[in-house]
Amino acid sequence: MKVSSQESNWQKTLPKPFLGFQKNRRLEEVECIIPDLAGMSRGRSMPIYKFTPDTTFSLPISLFYQTISGEYVDMDITNQWMEKDIVLRPDMETAAAVPWADDATLQVINDLELSDGNPLNIAPRNILKNVIDLYKKENLKPVIAPEIEFYLTQPNTDPNEEILPPIGRNGRKGVRQQAYSMVAVDEMGSVIDTIYEYAEAQGLKIDTVIQEGGAGQIEIN
């Protein structure tokens, strides 16, 4: 399949981390994503020939009525089940690689609008933009320090079985009370290396990786 000059031009303007990861592979797919109220990634994927930076498409507003467990909220919401459409508009400044995908894939976070072009006021990104605007009115600039904390575990496909700490390079399970241990971090070296690789591909800068107090408990800043 030939790629049109218009498609080729916008692809050449993608962020440097993406182009560096992409190298000479032909882009196959685009993931258009949004965060829901629980922080879950939702959206649609499409073949590259269906996407341009001006592409818009719709999703039902009811996706914002789902809880973290997939159930729907029990609230008195006017016309809750009319399945009114909301419009997704790509923010190309968020374009990033999807290094865990089998095919060459682009990921783009979208802004959410109503059909009349006004921002959807319950969309997390729009709420955050409103908060930032309040800071600007006071001549202030908010600065954040993101921190991700999680547990590494052994693979577990049976919910009836106990979740166990991962096996390290030395063949032993991780143990507790090893806060800030460099040895404990090194034991998880293959996973940490993959995290660094994926972060670089997405243009994310990692400052530090720390072993916390729990077995397999990792913190990334």
Where do the model's predicted regions map?
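Short, conserved phosphate-binding/catalytic loop or strand-edge motifs used
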Residues: 148, 212-220
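Short beta-strands and strand-loop turn motifs
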Residues: 176-177, 219-221
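ATP/Mg2+-dependent ligation/transfer catalytic cores
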Residues: 1-208
